[in-house]
Structures are given as structure tokens and as C-alpha cells.
């Protein structure tokens, strides 16, 4: 989509984003998880989707090849789909194991000074109150826009996913990433500033790929 936007600007043509149909049933996400944004100045949009009866396995060969061409190592179908959609829409996504989300709540709020958090790479990160976190009813589960936590990571035993697509403040992500010494594919995209409207299309695309 980034190339399409640049081409539209270069040739002075209107950019027409792809239309991705919403998949799933009539159940509401709110029946499974409550999302609360406490620091709206740092998170202009947060879209969540619940995916049940998940089976972890390898992603299709065509997807693995495309990810490899982008310099991304294929891992499994769920991680690969979130990475693929990130490259396709320039919209980072994250997947949580919903069964590990305490109280069925997602709270977007700043960290407390001196808090420590173990990220997916197994490193202990020292936080401060300028950093935005994704929390459940009891604990932080991700550093917003940068990296998820070990305490809610996807394993082969996952049954129900909580997918996240959000729009976090680019300046805050850049400063937090620098303080933590942790720059990721996701943070590098957020740093540039994202269109909040892309989140819904991206999460619909991810669900479409999961259903396939």
C-alpha cells in the first residue's frame, strides 16, 4: 500500500485503498474482552478481534516465500499472518493468547516509573511513565507499538487469539524505543505516523487470511 500511495502522489491520481470484507460471525468482541484507552493522546485508535478454535502450524509456502523476500523469518501461521499484513498494509499488528489476558480486559495506559517488563525476546526492560503499555486487569502484556510480553505470547497450545491493530503516537514510540534500546519492525513503522483508518482494514485482512 505504501508503494501505491507514493505512485498515486507521483502521478497525481487518487489513491483507492483495497476494500477488505469483514469476516466472522455476529458475536461481538465486547462479549469476550473489554478495551479501555486511558491515554488517548498516545493511542488514537485500538481495534481488537477475537479468533477462536486456532490451530498453530506452518503458513502457506507462498506466504513464507514473500516474507523471506522481505527479510522476515517465517515462524508459524499466526505470526506470519500478522507480519504479512504489516508489510502489506504498513500496519503493525500483535496477537495475544486471550486465555492469558486476566479479567478479559485490555487497558491502554502509561507505565509506572521503575516498572520492569519481560519482552518476547526474554529481556527485562526497565520502564518509565512516558512509555505506553498494553495491560490486562492485573499486569502489562505488551509495550505498545514495540514488542509484546512473554506473559501473553502465542504458543502451540493457544486456542483463542486476541488480535490487535492500533494507531499509536509515532513520536512517543520513537522516544520509548530509543530509551529501551529496542527498535523493531513495528516501532519503525509507527515512528513514521500511521493512518488510524488502516487498522480496521488490516485486522479484517488478517482474519481473512486466518480463515483461509
Feature map (PLM): residue ranges:
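RNA/tRNA-interacting regions in translation and RNA-turnover enzymes
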Residues: 1-212
Amino acid at each position: 500500500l505504501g508503494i501505491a500511495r507514493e505512485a498515486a502522489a507521483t502521478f497525481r491520481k487518487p489513491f483507492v485503498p483495497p476494500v477488505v470484507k469483514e469476516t466472522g460471525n455476529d458475536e461481538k468482541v465486547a462479549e469476550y474482552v473489554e478495551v479501555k484507552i486511558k491515554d488517548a493522546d498516545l493511542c488514537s485508535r485500538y481495534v481488537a478481534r477475537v479468533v477462536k478454535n486456532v490451530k498453530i502450524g506452518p503458513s502457506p509456502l507462498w506466504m513464507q516465500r514473500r516474507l523471506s523476500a522481505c527479510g522476515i523469518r517465517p515462524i508459524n501461521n499466526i505470526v506470519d499472518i500478522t507480519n504479512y499484513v504489516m508489510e502489506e498494509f504498513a500496519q503493525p499488528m500483535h496477537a495475544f493468547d486471550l486465555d492469558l489476558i486476566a479479567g478479559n480486559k485490555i487497558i491502554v495506559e502509561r507505565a509506572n516509573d521503575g516498572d520492569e517488563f519481560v519482552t518476547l525476546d526474554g529481556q527485562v526492560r526497565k520502564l518509565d511513565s512516558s512509555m505506553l503499555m498494553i495491560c490486562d486487569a492485573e499486569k502489562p502484556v505488551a509495550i505498545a507499538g514495540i514488542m509484546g510480553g512473554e506473559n501473553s505470547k502465542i504458543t502451540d497450545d493457544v486456542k483463542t487469539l486476541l488480535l490487535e491493530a492500533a494507531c499509536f503516537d509515532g513520536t512517543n514510540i520513537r522516544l520509548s524505543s530509543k530509551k529501551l534500546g529496542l527498535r523493531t519492525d513495528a516501532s519503525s513503522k509507527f515512528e513514521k505516523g500511521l493512518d488510524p483508518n488502516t487498522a480496521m482494514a488490516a485486522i479484517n485482512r488478517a482474519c481473512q487470511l486466518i480463515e483461509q
